[in-house]
Curated annotation (Swiss-Prot):
GO MF term list: endonuclease activity; metal ion binding
GO cellular component: cytoplasm
Reported function: May function in recognizing stalled ribosomes, interact with stem-loop structures in stalled mRNA molecules, and effect endonucleolytic cleavage of the mRNA. May play a role in the release non-functional ribosomes and degradation of damaged mRNAs. Has endoribonuclease activity.
Pfam families to which the protein is assigned, alphabetical: eRF1_1, eRF1_2, eRF1_3
Comment on protein domains: The N-terminal domain has the RNA-binding Sm fold. It harbors the endoribonuclease activity.
HAMAP family: PelO
Biological source species: Pyrococcus abyssi (strain GE5 / Orsay)
Annotated keywords: Cytoplasm, Endonuclease, Hydrolase, Metal-binding, Nuclease
Known EC number: 3.1.-.-
Subunit record text: Monomer.
Protein name: Protein pelota homolog
Subcellular location: Cytoplasm
GO biological process terms on file: nonfunctional rRNA decay; nuclear-transcribed mRNA catabolic process, no-go decay; nuclear-transcribed mRNA catabolic process, non-stop decay; ribosome disassembly; RNA surveillance
Cofactor: a divalent metal cation
Amino acid sequence: MEVLEEKPKEGKVKLKVETLDDLWHLYHVISPGDIVYAKTLRKQAQRSDSLRPEKVEAIPVFLGVRAEKINLHRFANQLRVTGPIVYASRDDVPLGKYHTIAVEPGMTITIQKERWRSHHVERIKEAVEASKRAKVMIVAMEDGEAEVAIVREYGLDFIASIRHNIGGKRYNVKREDEEKKFFHDVAKTIKDLIERENVQKVIVAGPGFYKENFYGFLRENYPELAGKVVLDDTSMGGRVGVYEVIKRGTVDKVYTETRVAQEIKLVEKVIERIAKDEPVAYGLKDVEEAVNYGAVDTLLVLDELLKGDDRERIEEIMEMARNLRANVVVVSSEHEGGDKLKALGGIAAILRFKIH
């Protein structure tokens, strides 16, 4: 994401949307009541002569829509913002009618808010910083099976599962042929994703020597891919192996700590503190009390809460925590750390001292 222009007095920020991750960030920035401006297509009936029916055409127009519904359609690579039109660049587009702006990578949009909360500003900054970081792919493989995932800002995006039935004993000619076909399939998948997603590093993980054999195959047949590969040991392949790579911190070693890895670590720290009866709070009531005491070191808030009925109350707690110099982290509901935080009420805090 790129910030093109800011107009603080008008509450406007103009942005260049670049990736699917940007759409996810914007989903958590745009709130009901905000106005989103963008070039879009709107179906308009064109008058014809009386003998012919009206012709409906999609005309290009610059619109401002007051957001009522905000939906992220990840598989379509779209963020759809629906609401009444409050501004139109053409006089023949009636104000007040409903329209959906489909925000996609490559588009330029402007967001206007009556009040920009600090967590909205932080989210924009994170998106800009994230666009500068290397994108990482994880391939967890074991004996004819490979799970391929990309580490995104919101969590793990499982892209492909590759499976070949590799039978027979080791060093059997037929088995070696099947294994080579499997390796070719995995390599081609990696190559396609590197080109499509602009991936800079590939972590190949798994138990035993299987990953080393694959790496040797890459060096011989796909040397340009081998240069992007980092090997890691995991107890299993498949999805379990992918999650193990995240927990082991291997992604962090490839580049600065990812948002996903950081969030999972913090949630695990909360759970560990609960088990050891160390300073911690969870659940809305207890966390709010801890913030009022000035006891919070790190506040964790599940992103879903910022779309729910308690949104304003949660935002006030976040503002107060920041004013008291607490670290505030919005945790994605798209990974296992988010699931665990949800089980704790969606909000928790690592405390500087006990309050009870």
